[in-house]
Amino acid sequence: MKKKLLAFALCTGAYAALFAYSVNSEQKTATSEMTDVSRLMPVKIKQTVKGQEEEMLIDTVKEANRKNIKISIAGAQHSMGGHTYYEDGIVLDMTGYNKILSLDQEKKTIRVQSGATWNDIQKYVNPYGLAVKVMQSQNIFTIGGSLSANAHGRDIRYGSLIDTVKSFRLLKADGMIITVTPKDDLFTAVIGGYGLFGVILDVTLELTDDELYVMKTEKMNYSTYSDYFSKHVKGNPDVRMHLARISTAKKGFLKDMYVTNYVLANHQDQLSSYSELKEDEYTGATKFALGLSRRYEWGRNWLWDTQQSYFLSQNGTEISRNNVMRSESKFLEYENNDNTDVLQEYFVPVKEYGSYIDDLRQTLSDEDLNLLNITIRYVQKNEKADLSYAKDDMFSLVLLINEGFSKEDQADTARIIRRMTDVAIKHGGSYYLPYMTYQTKAQMRQAYPKSEAFFQKKRTYDPDERFMNYFYQRYK
């Protein structure tokens, strides 16, 4: 029982990002229906092309130009909102384009094809004592997809993913391949650009040293969190990673919190004893517990109490950097004929957190939203990407929401999400773009003031809109 509770608590804390959906396809698959993990936007596509060789990708783009067919790009397909497919279009499935091309141990860089996952990189570099700088909490995402969303994670020292990219090669709409570096105009558009400028072929990323951390967890009230973070987390150079949770249970709703810091251990010479990479365990028990949380208020209360008790009991536990960045993921696979799980993510300036939570609580007090979980991370100010979400030092709040399939349920969830978005914008915040496109165009432009420049680049570099998805259709 103790092991099941342990696995359950670990798994339920991993909502940092984006859900999983895999396309079943051969090298080329004719017309079929495609959707994402939310199952809210099924459409008929013309063809899925599983890219394994560069020449095949080039030929596909040229053929699409000749026949005037739209192209969308899919990695592991974890985004929601139709970012990776388009009706009657070609989907390039990049998951087979996944080789590790080179590793420079001295410079701490790695070059990989875009269909490789973070798990592939971790397994390759772990024996050399190296680790990823910035990635999502889970390692199931492809590198190309992560660049396209400009991912972030638990690390609080290295910023967003864009800060760790040395260069990448891009297959453009005209069938030509170019190398893109930080000095190039396309660099800030492609990273965080959701596949709208071409096919990312391979990427050179900065790595860092694997390290041994000590887990330290404590409870607190939301009103003290901003000051606590500034003084004891950001202000302590030995804290390398950070994760927080705020209660969605009726008891302590949006008030009770606990935080987990990953602090540099004093005895780094013992890292090898902790460097074996962990894998998913006890998925069934975790899914069952989450099912209770979806259906019953007492289940949500129990979920919160169990998570909190477990992590508090782990004070002093030692863990490698690579293993911190391997949160469980299989439990996220959820199928039900009546409802589905969706994510929303809001970014709020650190100094605004307390008043933002008060306003969010007030907003939700008269709403019937099945809000299952909120995890919180830190993202330092970074406005390099054209669609940058971190206009200030921000807290990122990832909300897991269960919603029904009916048109009425979807419309109601969309309405509430727009209300929550207004709250974030009111406090100088923004929201993350890979999820359902429920926000209005006006909200998108408020949250992303450089969006018009981004769309102008799209019109300049891809005037025929060869690369297309529903995100672009919605907000262009």
UniProtKB/Swiss-Prot annotation:
Sites bearing Pros-8alpha-FAD histidine, chain numbering: H78
Cofactor requirement: FAD
Residue intervals of the FAD-binding PCMH-type domain: 41-210
SUPFAM superfamilies linked: FAD-binding/transporter-associated domain-like (SSF56176), FAD-linked oxidases, C-terminal domain (SSF55103)
EC number: 1.-.-.-
Classification via PROSITE patterns: FAD_PCMH
Keyword terms, alphabetized: FAD, Flavoprotein, Oxidoreductase, Signal
Record-stated family: Belongs to the oxygen-dependent FAD-linked oxidoreductase family.
The protein, known as: Uncharacterized FAD-linked oxidoreductase YitY
UniProt lineage: Bacteria, Bacillati, Bacillota, Bacilli, Bacillales
Name of the coding gene: yitY
